[in-house]
Amino acid sequence: MARLTGRRGGGKSPSAGGGVQGLEPLTERLSNHKVTRLALSFLDANDGLHLKDLALETMADDRRASFDGHHFWNFGSDSFLGLDRHPRVHEAIRDALPEWGSHNGASRAFSSPLLTDEAEAKLAAWLGVSDTFIFPSVTLANVGLLPAIAGAGDLLIVDRESHDSVHQGARLAAAGGARLEQVPAPDPRVVADVIRRVDARGTVMAIDGVYSMSGKTPPLVELDATVRGLGGTLYVDDAHGTGVVGPRGRGAAAAALGTLDNILMVGSLSKAFSCLGAFVTCTADLKT
């Protein structure tokens, strides 16, 4: 295989008047972080090359990728169904651009584009739920939703193997007063013990529908029965199951539970749907 050269830069950036000095203490401090040290050790072991530093020059319909003039098969794409190359998708984009432009130009708190309302209704019909709400990404959904549904006096249980964005949202919820408990494995008995032990106003358990690193699925049926039986709500980040797992691709949660009426399920629009965004299932009252 031909060796690739990345776009990774080196050395100090010039700055008039020495303005870069204000960034040097920050750079030095961050360089000592354990995650940074791990990344740097990887780079040292691989001649300073990391995939994130490669500039993708072209992507063919058959997933051949071009980096630095070399061609490879791309097995790292998260466009699960290849819909980003589907002619009907391209046609819909071309038809919408003259009327709607490339950006809605406003917050959802100010107005909601008709196309967004239509998309949320179609997602709800596809999933068999009352309603859905679209977010810019799954990460933003998790960091926005978890602090909103688990506040002061509430218990938030998080599976340790859940996606990092779930943990980010959980930390924000904890900063807002929620009691945060991590469980090392999604064992319904352990979860039940935690709920019974903690005196909380309400309970939410956050977990992945499909673990992004292993592809495994947790015991959602047992967890839903346990959490709901003790007065709580199951919150499932099903980003990696949306569109590809279960009947009609409704995801791991729907495949396991049969219905999404009693849980909150976050799905991705950036993977199987090949666009950008996320959604959460909800009722009209929750959406309001």
Question: What are these language model-derived features?
Answer:
Residues 3-22, 36-100, 232:
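N-terminal "arm"/small-domain region of PLP-dependent enzymes with the aminotransferase-like
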Residues 82-83, 109-113, 164, 188-189, ...:
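Short, small-residue-enriched loops and turns at beta-alpha junctions
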Residues 91-137:
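Conserved N-terminal alpha-helix of the aminotransferase class I/II PLP-enzyme fold
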Residues 137, 158-174:
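Substrate-binding/gating loop at the entrance of the active-site cleft, primarily
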Residues 146-164:
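Conserved PLP-anchoring active-site segment centered on the Schiff-base-forming lysine
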Residues 181-236:
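Active-site phosphate-binding strand-loop segment of PLP-dependent enzymes
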Residues 248, 254-288:
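Active-site PLP attachment segment
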